[in-house]
Amino acid sequence: MADPEPEKAQLSSSLNMSAKKELLSTAMKRTSEWIFSQEIPSDVTVHVGEASFSLHKFPLVSKCGHIRKLVSESTDADLATVELPNCPGGAEAFELAAMFCYGINFEIGTENIAMLRCAAEYLEMTEEYAVGNLVGRTEAYINEVALKSLAGAVSVLHMSQSLLPTAEKVKLVSRCIDAIAFVACKDSHFSMLGRASDIGHHNKGLPSKPIVDWWAEDLTVLRIDIFQRVLVAMMSRGYKHYSLGPVLMLYAQKSLRGLQEVFGKGRKKIEPQQEHEKRVVLETIVSLLPREKNAFDLS
């Protein structure tokens, strides 16, 4: 009997490729609409990954320092093609940045702010080139909106994982981690005060039944190395090591599903990369385990 797994993988790959081509086609169609609305023929084609955008040099060079340099330093006086192979966030992020250059309104939110900030950095969209440029706009949203709530900070941090190293360069990762640690420790402090009256027994001064805090679920979407950095930041702010037990348990339950099938008897076949990732998760969690008794008593 034929193994259905390769067929499923091939089908999934085909569907992903089809969806990708459809998204790129939609992006190029939208840019064509921008050109038509300007009633001026495009004079530059910008290639970002597999997507091509037919645009105008003037709105781009007026706000994008990186593109201005490429145009000015080119030996071709009528440079008609610009390559941006390393734009963070790819075609989706560049499309939004281009819309900003054209003065087209779009909504900024926690789901796109990370790639917008990183794309703006890559394109050098600073105040040096235009007042109220994209770097300043995104920074204002990050500081005044995104990092004001734990959900916002976690969402931005989650999106930043695919935008390294630029997200590290603009300190987006470190700022999100600090904001999460601050909120989590603040919440833990007040919740522990509220629980004090319900705790009848202590083991060497420690609560005998740790409770999973409301924010712990949000952290399970983070990559293990980023998750570890969050916990280290929390402990540096005074979060008690023994309180990590329930948080680690929750993360392990989410990220190590099927572990017994992989490493136990009758091992299930798994790709080397996936096996390595699960090993790293397991080893990291073990290294973070609290040493106090009853740290995992969730009953």
Segments from the language model and where they lie:
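N-terminal BTB/POZ boundary and linker segment
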Residues: 1-55, 92, 99-110, 152-236
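Canonical BTB/POZ domain core
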Residues: 41-53, 59-128, 143, 206-245, ...
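Short, conserved phosphate-binding/catalytic loop or strand-edge motifs used
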Residues: 114-118, 136-139, 155
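Alpha-helical bundle protein-protein interaction modules that mediate dimerization/oligomerization
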Residues: 123, 138, 145, 157, ...
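Classical protein tyrosine phosphatase
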Residues: 129-133
